[in-house]
Amino acid sequence: MAGIGFELKKLFRRKGLFASLRAYGYAGIICTGPMLLGVVLQLGILLLCSWVGAPRDQQDLLVCMITYTLLFSLTVTSFFSMPVTRYLADMLYEEQEHTILPSFWGSGSLMLVLGCPLYGLFLLVSGATLLQGLLCLWLFAEMIVNWNGMSYLTAIKDYRGILCSFLAAIALAFGLGAVLVVLLGCPVLEGMLFAVAMGYGLMMIWDVVLLYRYFPQSDASPWAFLRWVDAFLPLAFTGLCTNLGLFAHLVICWAGPVGVQVKGLFYGAAYYDVPALIAFLTILITSVNFVVSVEVNFYPKYRNYYSLFNDGGVVGDIVTAEEEMLAVLNRELRFTALKQLFATAAVLSLEGTLLDLLPLGFNDLMHGYFRTLCVGYGLYAVGNTLLMILLYFTDYRGAVAAAAVFAASAGGLTALSMAFDPAFYGFGFLIGAALFYLVALFRLDAFTSNLPYRVLGRQPIVAESRSGWFTRLGLFLEHHKGTEREEKKNES
């Protein structure tokens, strides 16, 4: 992400309000792509359904199906996204670009094989019709490929191409939905699901074309990345736990007193979901700032510091470089926290006026949820920034510990809050996010207090290679692929 941050930084050097707005627009879409696209599509589809006079139960079921598909796909990809990103970074550093495309298809295939049967089984017993289930499964498969592709797209630094794929997906989904439902008279639920699936499908094709334009095709093993999953297993659980902590409170509230059974196993809690959806947008400030400010300003100091160890720098230069790096890091983290604080305070002061202007039917309970979740998401955003810095310093144990605390506390405390008045439901996530922030902060402070020891003293004396279940799976798949090649050669 630092690479694309440097590209986006060029936009911020241009003067003028329009240039700044365009730069922040690019950064916001790229940095929070999956969730932002989901939010825009959800809100747009609701407006379109209201415009055509769709029954409320159909609207609720449509939102539930898209939300379930989105969360299922993000959960599956969250386990593999960080190890795959690490593999991608290592291959680019070693100038082995020919391994990139095979790993993209290998990782995507594995996620599809793991995720589609599980989600398909859920759809079978969920109460959805056959057509609705097939459309949801199709959308799920597209989302898996898209979210996996986001890790690869940031490497090519083509932010305009990424932006165009997002805009094209939204335009096609809305346009096709209007044609199917308004002009052709198709059923609202099935027509809009098909339109959304086509929109995500266009984005998938667009992104794959971008990848093929930048990376060469080759016969390299598509399963080599699995060794990275074993070698960096804490990264996999860091991604999974962060995802669980971020979304568990929503699922728990669906099953709580404010939840409503829409159809079969599809539940929703509009009084909680809508405030959470809008409150989530407040973290855009920190997400954008991390890429275009924290990483861009911190990374050169970070690279210089570690290059002194690799290139035989003298002790005095190393000490000076460490002081400069940590000074820049502390300054950027402080500015990030202040920006998020001001953004949250501004939203809280204006939310009563602005939200009442929207046709969302906010009541006092929803306003309370919104205020609570705004603070919670703000703490999460800053805590997630600290988590990313821990990953920069390869403190994978500290990162997975912070993420695990977040997942356990946010989910556990939200479940505990179900025994109290509904007004307290959002506090479980808020406290979990606060603990996430504090654990990450204290861990980063402890880790950087003795950085030379962390860099040198904790390294293994001899090289270690971890061979676990994923490595064995990769060897098995590669052996199977080699056997098929031999059979084809013999036949020819």
Across the structure, where does each feature detected by a protein language model lie?
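N-terminal membrane topogenesis motif
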Residues: 1-42, 60, 64, 226-235, ...
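Hydrophobic alpha-helical transmembrane segments
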Residues: 165-212, 423-445
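Alpha-helical transmembrane segments of multi-pass membrane proteins
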Residues: 67-72, 108-113, 121-153, 343-349, ...
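Specific pore-lining/lateral-gate transmembrane helices of multi-pass inner-membrane transport
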Residues: 92-104, 273-357
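Transmembrane helical elements of multi-pass membrane transporters/channels
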Residues: 195-199, 203-295
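Small-residue-rich midsections of specific transmembrane alpha-helices
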Residues: 63-89, 243, 247, 276-301
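Hydrophobic faces of transmembrane alpha-helices in multi-pass small-molecule transporters and flippases
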Residues: 20-36, 163, 221-248, 333-342, ...
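Alpha-helical transmembrane segments of multi-pass membrane transporters/permeases
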Residues: 153-179, 390-412
